[in-house]
Amino acid sequence: AQAAPVPRPVXLSKKTDSF
């Protein structure tokens, strides 16, 4: 639910993890 894509830990979100 965030406007800007933030680097998330692997596993949590693979889609946003690439950012």
From Swiss-Prot:
Q: What is its main location?
A: mitochondrion
Q: Which UniProt keywords apply?
A: Glycolysis, Membrane, Mitochondrion, Oxidoreductase, Thiamine pyrophosphate
Annotated GO CC locations: mitochondrial membrane
Q: Which reaction does it catalyse?
A: N(6)-[(R)-lipoyl]-L-lysyl-[protein] + 2-oxoglutarate + H(+) = N(6)-[(R)-S(8)-succinyldihydrolipoyl]-L-lysyl-[protein] + CO2
GO biological-process terms attached to the record: generation of precursor metabolites and energy; glycolytic process
Q: Does the keyword Cytoplasm apply?
A: no
Tell me what this protein is called. Answer: 2-oxoglutarate dehydrogenase, mitochondrial
